[in-house]
Regions:
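Ankyrin-repeat inter-repeat connecting loop/turn
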Residues: 150-154, 187, 221-223, 256-260, ...
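Short, tandemly repeated low-complexity microdomains enriched for cysteine and small residues
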Residues: 191, 222-227, 249, 258-264, ...
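Start-of-repeat signature of ankyrin repeats
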Residues: 124, 160-161, 194, 230, ...
Length: 795
C-alpha cells in the first residue's frame, strides 16, 4: 500500500522515528552541531595517546587532557573528538558495525575519505545510505543480491527518515537513483517532513535524477505529493530558484499520461506562494516567469475571500514583471479583472501608494480609465489619496480628466472635497491639463519670417506637386528618454485629432529614435510603443554596465520577428543610423528599407545602400543602439549611431537629396520636402564649467585644477560629439528653410540630469511631466502651427 502524505500519517512517521532515536539511549550523535571535517592525524600523535580497546579500523583514543578522539586507523584520520566519552563511544559503536566491504569498495574508487566524511556526519546511516550519498554503485549492486534487499533498501535514518533513494536524489547521484529504482525502491516513500525523492531532487536542482525517476519510477503518481507545508516538488523548485527543474517539470503539463498539478493545493495559490517567498533572486523570478508562460491562466486565479487575483495583491515590481513578462499577450488573461469590491489591480496599486506597480501594470496592458462600481476611476482615487506622482503619471498616460462618478463628481470635485496637504499642488496639475493656456510664440522675428514663408509656399502648391512632396519625421537618440519622443508624438496626435503617421512619408531615427521609427513604420500604435518602453527599461538595464546585449536582441525579435528591412509593413521610407567603429575615421552607416531607384546593386553598395533582404530589423536596431559602454558592439564593428548622428535630421535631408539625384538621373520626378518634424529626447540643464585651462602644474592646487580642466574638456568633447541640439538643429533648420520647407523642432529642457539608462519610476514620471508642461507652454505655439499645417496640406 502506498503511503499518503496526510497529517495523520506524517505524525505516525514522526513518532516512529522518535522511537528509533530513543533506542540510542538519548545520546546526541552530533546532528545538531555537525563535527568538523575529518583530518589526517600523525602516527606520533596517536602513540602519545592511550587506545581504548582493540577495535579496528575504528578506534577511540584518550589523550592526557581526557579528550577522546575517534580515529579511522587506516589513514589514520581523526573523525571527531570531545570530552564526552559516552557520545564518542556511542558513535564508535555505530561505525564499527559498518561492513569492511563498504570501505574496500570506497578505496577502489578513491572515495574512502568521502565515505568517512559522510559517516562522521551521519553515524546512524546504513551502508546503503552512505553508498547512495557517495555514489558507490558497486556496493549497492552487491547488496541488491541479498534476500532481505526489500527490507534494507527501505531502511530510514533515525533523524530525517530518509531512505537511500532520498539521499541519492538529494545528492544528485542520478546513476544511483536509476539503479535503486530498477532494483525496486519505492519512489512514494516519504521522509519525516512528508517529502518524497522528487521533493529532495527538486529542492537541490538535480534535474537528471528527476529524469531517471520518470524513466524508471512512477513519477506521475508522485509528482504532485504535498509535504507537511503543502509544498509539491514544483513549489520547492520555484522557492529555491531551480530553473532547470521547473523547466523539466513543466514538460509534464496536461499531457495524456502525466499531469502536473498547478491549482487546488491545500495551502492555496502557487503564485501567492511565490509572492510570499522572502529574498527572491533572479533565478526565482525566472522560475515564476516560466510557470506563468506555461500556465498564464494562473494570473486570473482568485486567491482570497475578497476575490483578489495575484495582480491585485502584488506589491513587488520585480515579482509582477516576472509573472507578466512572457504571458501578458495571452488573450485570455484579464489584466483588468475586478475583485469583490469591483476594484481593478490599478485601483489597488493607487490605494497602496505604489507608483512602480501602477506603471508596471499600465505597461503590461492594464487600463487606467476603468471605474469601480461607484464610477470612480483611478484618477478619482489618486486625487483623493493625494499622491502627486501617481496623479502626474495618470495624466501623462492620458487618464480621463473629465470622468464623472455615479455621484456626479468630477475629478476636480473629488479633489476639492479632500483634505490632504497636496491639494493645491494637485489642483495645479489638473489645471495644466484642463486649460489651453496662454499660447505664446517664442521665436524671433527672423525665424517667424522664414517659417511663415516656407509654410505659405508649401500650402500654395497644386495637388500634383503635393503628391510628389514628402513630410519628414526625424527622431533623436537618447536611451530611455525615447519616452519623451513618444509623449510628444502622442500629444501632437491628440491635438491633430487623427492618425499622425498618415501625414508622414519618410522617417529616420538614431538609437532609441530608431526603435520608435521602426515601430511606426511597422504600424505599431504610439500607445503600444509607449508601453513597450515601460517594459523595456526594467528588462534591459539590469546590473552594471555594459548590459546584456542578448536581452536587447530578444526584445527586438519578440516585437519585430526575423523580418528584414525589405519586409517592413508600411510603404513609408525609413532608416536607422549606426556607426562603423572598427575603422578610423569612423563611418556613418544607414540601414534603410529602400534602395536608389533604377541603379545596380553595385552602385547602391558603393553608396552605402545595404541589400535589404540581408538586414534583419532586429540587427539594424541592435547596431543603432550599441552605445559604447552600455552594450557590446555588433560583430565587433557597429556601434550606436548617436556617436556621429544623434540628431539624424541633416542626414535625412542629405539622403532624400541623394534619392532625388537618382530619380533625376532616370528622368523621374524628384520628391520635394514639404515639412520636417524633428523631435529630441530633451536637454539636461546647463552647467557652469569653472576651468578649461590645461597647464603644466607647479603645485598641488594646479594639479587639482588641471585635472578638473581635463575632465571638463572631456565632457565638452563628448557632449559635442553626440550633440542633438544647438548647431545640428540650426543647420537643419537653415537647410530646410533654404528649400522652403517648414521646420518644427520639439525638445524640452529638464530640471535635472536624466541618464540614458535611467529606470527610476519617479524620475521617469518627472521627465514625462516636464515634457507635458513644455508642450502646453513653450512648445504650444509650434504644436498649433504644425497641426494647422498638416490639416491644411491636403494630398
Amino acid at each position: 500500500m502506498k503511503f499518503k502524505s496526510t497529517p495523520e500519517n506524517i505524525t505516525l512517521v514522526q513518532n516512529a522515528f522518535q522511537t528509533i532515536q530513543n533506542t540510542t539511549g538519548g545520546i546526541s550523535l552530533g546532528r545538531k552541531s555537525l563535527p568538523d571535517s575529518i583530518t589526517l592525524i600523525k602516527e606520533s600523535v596517536l602513540t602519545s595517546m592511550t587506545k581504548l580497546g582493540n577495535s579496528y579500523p575504528f578506534a577511540v583514543y584518550q589523550d592526557k587532557s581526557n579528550i577522546y578522539h575517534l580515529v579511522y586507523e587506516k589513514g589514520p584520520y581523526l573523525l571527531r573528538k570531545g570530552g564526552d566519552k559516552k557520545t564518542i563511544l556511542s558513535v564508535h559503536n555505530l561505525l564499527s558495525k559498518l561492513p569492511l566491504g563498504l570501505f574496500n569498495i570506497a578505496e577502489e574508487n578513491g572515495n574512502e575519505e568521502l565515505v568517512l566524511e559522510w559517516i562522521n556526519k551521519y553515524p546512524d546511516w546504513s551502508p546503503l545510505h552512505v553508498s547512495a550519498a557517495v555514489g558507490l554503485e558497486k556496493y549497492i549492486l552487491k547488496e541488491s543480491q541479498r534476500s532481505d534487499w526489500e527490507v534494507i533498501s527501505c531502511q530510514v535514518d533515525s533523524h530525517d527518515g530518509k531512505t537511500p533513494l532520498h539521499i541519492a536524489s538529494e545528492e544528485g547521484n542520478d546513476k544511483i537513483v536509476s539503479l535503486l529504482l530498477q532494483k525496486g525502491c519505492d519512489l512514494s516513500k516519504l521522509d519525516i517532513k512528508g517529502e518524497n525523492s522528487i521533493h529532495l531532487a527538486s529542492r537541490k536542482g538535480n534535474v537528471e535524477c528527476i529524469s531517471k525517476m520518470f524513466e524508471f519510477g512512477d513519477l506521475s503518481k508522485n509528482i504532485n505529493i504535498e509535504n507537511e507545508n503543502g509544498e509539491t516538488p514544483l513549489h520547492l523548485a520555484i522557492s529555491n530558484g531551480q530553473v532547470d527543474v521547473v523547466e523539466y517539470l513543466l514538460l509534464f503539463k496536461e499531457s495524456d499520461i502525466h499531469y502536473l498539478k498547478i491549482k487546488g493545493f491545500s495551502k492555496g495559490s502557487i503564485l501567492e506562494y511565490g509572492r510570499r517567498i522572502e529574498n527572491k533572486n533572479t533565478s526565482i523570478y525566472k522560475c515564476l516567469t516560466l510557470l506563468c508562460q506555461s500556465y498564464p491562466e494562473l494570473i486570473n486565479e482568485v486567491i482570497d475571500k475578497d476575490k483578489n487575483n495575484i495582480l491585485h495583491l502584488s506589491t513587488d515590481k520585480l515579482f509582477l514583471q516576472a509573472l507578466l513578462s512572457e504571458s501578458h499577450t495571452c488573450t485570455y488573461i484579464d489584466v483588468n479583472a475586478t475583485n469583490r469590491f469591483g476594484l481593478t489591480p490599478i485601483h489597488k496599486a493607487i490605494l497602496n501608494d505604489n507608483l512602480s506597480i501602477l506603471i508596471t501594470l499600465y505597461g503590461y496592458g492594464c487600463s487606467i480609465n476603468n471605474s469601480d462600481p461607484s464610477g470612480d476611476t483611478p484618477l478619482h482615487y489618486a486625487v483623493r489619496s493625494g499622491n502627486i506622482q501617481i496623479v502626474k503619471a495618470l495624466l501623462c498616460f492620458n487618464a480621463n480628466i473629465k470622468a464623472i462618478n455615479n455621484n456626479g463628481e468630477s475629478i476636480m470635485c473629488v479633489l476639492q472635497k479632500s483634505n490632504h496637504s497636496n491639494k493645491d499642488i494637485i489642483k495645479k496639475c489638473l489645471d495644466l491639463f484642463e486649460s489651453q493656456g496662454n499660447i505664446q510664440d517664442h521665436t524671433d522675428e527672423l525665424e517667424r519670417f522664414e517659417q511663415s514663408n516656407s509654410m505659405a509656399y508649401q500650402l500654395k502648391k497644386d495637388i500634383e506637386n503635393k503628391k510628389h512632396s514628402v513630410n519628414v519625421l526625424s527622431l533623436d537618440g537618447g536611451g530611455v528618454k525615447g519616452m519623451v519622443i513618444i509623449q510628444i508624438l502622442l500629444y501632437i496626435e491628440k491635438r491633430l485629432g487623427s492618425d499622425l503617421m498618415k501625414h508622414f512619408d519618410w522617417i529616420s531615427g538614431t538609437s532609441t529614435g530608431g526603435i520608435i521609427a521602426i515601430g511606426l513604420a511597422e504600424e505599431m500604435p504610439l500607445l503600444s510603443i509607449q508601453k513597450l518602453y515601460l517594459r523595456f527599461k526594467d528588462k534591459v538595464f539590469i546590473g552594471e554596465r555594459p548590459y546584456n546585449s542578448e536581452v536587447l536582441k530578444k526584445i527586438f525579435i519578440d516585437n519585430f520577428g526575423n523580418k528584414t528591412m525589405a519586409e517592413i509593413k508600411s510603404d513609408k521610407k525609413v532608416f536607422v543610423t549606426t556607426v562603423q567603429g572598427n575603422v578610423c575615421p569612423s563611418e556613418l552607416c544607414l540601414f534603410r528599407n529602400y534602395m536608389l531607384p533604377g541603379f545596380s546593386d553595385e552602385i547602391n553598395k558603393n553608396r552605402g545602400f545595404f541589400q535589404l533582404n540581408k538586414v534583419p530589423i532586429w540587427k539594424a536596431l541592435r547596431c543603432s543602439t550599441a552605445a559604447p559602454t552600455y552594450f557590446e558592439a555588433v560583430d565587433n564593428k557597429y556601434i550606436d549611431g548617436g556617436v556621429m548622428a544623434n540628431n539624424p535630421t541633416i542626414n535625412t535631408i542629405a539622403d532624400i537629396q541623394l534619392y532625388n539625384t537618382a530619380l533625376n538621373a532616370k528622368n523621374q520626378k524628384p520628391h520635394e520636402i514639404s515639412c520636417i518634424l524633428s523631435i529630441g529626447t530633451g536637454k539636461n540643464p546647463k552647467k557652469t564649467v569653472e576651468s578649461l585651462n590645461v597647464n603644466l602644474p607647479t603645485g598641488i592646487t594646479d594639479v587639482i585644477t588641471t585635472a578638473r580642466s581635463i575632465i571638463n574638456l572631456k565632457n565638452i568633447f563628448l557632449e559635442q560629439l553626440t550633440s542633438a541640439d544647438g548647431e545640428p538643429v540650426n543647420r537643419a533648420r537653415s537647410w530646410a528653410h533654404t528649400m522652403k520647407s517648414p521646420f518644427f523642432r520639439f525638445s524640452p529642457t529638464f530640471t535635472e540630469d536624466i541618464e540614458l539608462d535611467c529606470k527610476d519610476d519617479n524620475v521617469i514620471v518627472n521627465m514625462l511631466w516636464e515634457t507635458e508642461k513644455y508642450l502646453r507652454k513653450d512648445g504650444a505655439c509650434d504644436v498649433l502651427m504644425l497641426t494647422g499645417f498638416l490639416e491644411n496640406f491636403k494630398r
